[in-house]
Amino acid sequence: MTEQTPARQASHANRATRAEIWRLIKPFWVSEERWKAWALLLAILALNLGMVYINVRLNSWNRDMYNVLQSRDYPQFKSLLWQFSGLAFVFVAIAIYSVYLKQALQIRWRYWMSTRYLDRWLAHRAYYRIEQGQEGRLSDNPDQRIAEDLHALTSDTLSLVLGFISSSVTLFSFIHILWSVSGPLSFTALGQSWVIPGYMVWFVIAYAAIGSGVVWWIGRPLVGLSFNQERFEANFRFGLIRVREHAEAVALYRGEPQERAQLTARLDDIRENWWNIMRLTKKLNVAVNFYGQFAVIFPMLVSAPRYFSGAISLGVLMQISDAFGQVQDALSWFINAFTTLASWKASINRLAGFHADVERAAGMPRTLAVTQHGGSAVTLEGVQLSFPDGSLMLRRLDARVESGEHVLISGPSGCGKSTLIRAMADIWPYGEGRIALPQDAPAMFLPQRSYLPIGTLRAALSYPAAEGSFEDALITRYLGLCRLAHLASRLDVAANWSQALSPGEQQRLAFVRVFLNRPRLVFLDEASSAMDGETEEALYAALPRELPGVTVISIAHRETLARFHDVRWKFVPPAAGEGAGHRVEALPIAV
């Protein structure tokens, strides 16, 4: 989870084009899931059409029932009750299975999209490059995009599409009923006689058009406000998680007042934006509720003269009222769905930005090539490293590390030592040159702070291999070697091990991983900085003993570790007149 850069993202809030929307929605419907997806969709549409048909039947039933009540025809009244029971039973069954199949289609779509987005986010280390390229990002919090926005996209898209289709079918089913039963409207104006056939149809169209226009005019800022609300909520949640992750450091620094101030500032953003949403929603609700309530009485007001003149019966009056309501509700799809549309559009915008970030990260031009070759040495040819802004960090480096050789990288803090390790791990794209690693030599990279997945200790020790890949006896042996024997009885205990273990224990656990996975190349980026000197030296001495022929490239500041290495790569600051960028001197280490 990361905090966003608001200026660029806010400008992207309303930019999702129809092409981007189609690019987000289309893939699932042409994928290997398409047959099941289309079958479910067609089944849902068929059920929805069935509900429209039942509503048409109920419209006629409504007319007959009020006519029966007006004529006090008790036998026909009982017959209509039985008829209603059958229609109601079928309607309820259709409604239940329509929702059930819609939920089934939704989870299929969401699961398919989530797995594809996870693949894209994790492929080519896009997740890492997105975090590194903060200034050019269009989206924030990839976890929220995948977990929440994909859910909203699938749910809202189905609701909107199915609702629109049902409204369209309802409109065409009832508009001819309304036309036929409303009859003509005759009046005199401007000295002429006028006749409007099916006048209720024109009234309902005008009524819905005016209402939709008013709602759109009032509610159009809601998309941007919804976008910002999600952003502010994510930033607040991110701040809370940061306090949890660094609870010990915050406590030691007595940083509670500062953390509270920062969290309160983010909470203030949520409150201010929420008040804006409340004010806009209040105006929107005034228009929507006035529109909806007046629609109840409007058809009766317009039809009442014909009823009181005896031109139509009570049943026809109620049929007109019901048909008017059905047509008005169908034409009001935009009004009824406006809040969902605003939320859907905000989700589309965020996903479009996230999609663009992933594509840009995956397609980032690579002038620094990391390849594999059939030899046994690690070679660096013309390697230059840069900062993301293009300024030079490391000047040309040509070097070769033979199989079994141990290299110590040293130099002042911030000179690019860790970046060189990242470049060899193929996660730093800024630079040029060529790095070649042995093809048949699996590698492991140990950062200063190791990643410990939440779960059992066995899973944390086995990572990145699957849990259960190693026998207990082997795990226990290496726990003892790394001075973690006290953890041997807790292999199946699930915990947040990054919180349960001290920094030194976490680094020793990372060495257990190395011994278990037995790589041929080991890169250590201050991977023992939290250990005591005796333990650190014991583990460095164990590397060639437990992994004969292993190649080690490590960064360390303690000179006591030099004796475990063959060569030193010393980062030297540029001399006067040399320009920016450190250079590397390769120096043999006398044993």
Language-model segments: what does each one mean?
Residues 1-55, 60, 64-84, 98, ...:
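Membrane-integrated ABC transporters
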Residues 54-63, 67-70, 91-129, 158-162, ...:
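Juxtamembrane helix-loop junctions of ABC transporter transmembrane domains
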Residues 219, 223, 234, 238, ...:
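Cytosolic ends of transmembrane helices, especially the final helix of ABC transmembrane type-1 domains
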Residues 5-30, 43, 47, 52, ...:
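Intrinsically disordered cytosolic tails
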Residues 6-11, 72-75, 104-107, 117-144, ...:
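Short intracellular "coupling" helices and adjacent cytoplasmic loop segments at the cytosolic face
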Residues 371-591:
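ABC-type nucleotide-binding domain
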Residues 43-46, 50, 59, 94, ...:
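A hydrophobic transmembrane-helix motif
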